[in-house]
């Protein structure tokens, strides 16, 4: 499955550029080990989660992800000789990365879950933070926030990003390049009490593309592969060799 390998290797490359991680990767040679854990993580997740229901899907995701963090952390310490500090950093990065991929998946599949949406800026005079409210078909309240670091994201751009998904940007580069000048995050916070009183447990973040990714996706016309990869991760992992 080429898409999975591409995603995981690009994530690992980003980790290697992080100064806090460089020594860990160089001394422990963990690249192939972490790639194996990626495959194990997604295979296990697919076997436990098959529902299109947003409540059960997200609850299962958080429970599985937290449990896997403990397993991965322990394996880094016991099998790879990492210090507790090193193992914590790597396991946190791992959890953050799989969280990003899941958030991307939910955004691209938004229409399958969401029944109605409204748009309400946090501060109409400051487009740095813009919010939308959505309600899923099974009654889950979802707050969607775009942290717009450079302040140039207008209403239409936000609506296309949050409501119709990142796919819109990749298929409409003429509209995307005008405002994707700085990296930003999309935060999905599931606030319904059926999840948890601690809303942070159910917050998914995805880093939206910045200048270098614009070059990669739009110049190479690689967005179809990206779209397919999100589905492949959850649907076709039994074919990974």
Go through each PLM region and give its residues.
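Catalytic cores of nucleic-acid endonucleases
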Residues: 141, 146-216
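Extended, compositionally biased low-complexity polar/Lys-Gly-rich tracts
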Residues: 64, 100, 107, 130-134, ...
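Catalytic centers of nucleases
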Residues: 94, 98-166
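Non-catalytic C-terminal interaction segments of nucleic acid-processing enzymes
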Residues: 207-241
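Interdomain/boundary linker segments immediately adjacent to catalytic/signaling cores
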Residues: 1-102
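Solvent-exposed amphipathic alpha-helical surface segments
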Residues: 110, 172, 237-240
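Glycine-rich, flexible loop segments associated with nucleotide phosphate handling
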Residues: 88-95, 127-130, 180-184
């Amino acid at each position: 499955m080429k898409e999975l390998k591409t995603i995981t290797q690009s994530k690992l490359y980003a980790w290697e550029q992080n100064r806090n991680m460089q020594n860990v990767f160089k001394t422990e040679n963990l690249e192939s080990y972490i790639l194996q854990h990626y495959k194990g993580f997604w295979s296990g997740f697919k076997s436990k989660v098959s529902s299109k229901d947003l409540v059960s899907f997200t609850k299962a995701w958080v429970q599985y992800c937290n449990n896997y963090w403990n397993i991965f952390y322990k394996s880094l310490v016991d099998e790879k000789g990492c210090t507790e500090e090193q193992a914590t950093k790597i396991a946190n990065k791992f959890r953050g990365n799989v969280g990003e991929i899941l958030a991307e998946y939910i955004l691209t599949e938004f229409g399958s879950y969401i029944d109605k949406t409204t748009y309400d800026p946090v501060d109409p005079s400051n487009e740095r933070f813009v919010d939308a409210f959505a309600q899923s078909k099974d009654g889950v309240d979802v707050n969607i926030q775009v942290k717009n670091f450079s302040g140039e994201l207008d209403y239409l751009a936000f609506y296309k990003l949050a409501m119709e998904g990142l796919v819109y940007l990749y298929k409409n580069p003429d509209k995307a390049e005008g405002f994707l000048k700085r990296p930003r995050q999309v935060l999905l916070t599931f606030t319904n009490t059926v999840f948890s009183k601690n809303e942070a447990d159910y917050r998914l973040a995805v880093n939206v593309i910045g200048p270098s990714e614009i070059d990669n996706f739009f110049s190479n016309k690689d967005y179809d592969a990206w779209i397919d990869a999100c589905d492949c991760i959850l649907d076709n992992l039994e074919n990974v060799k």
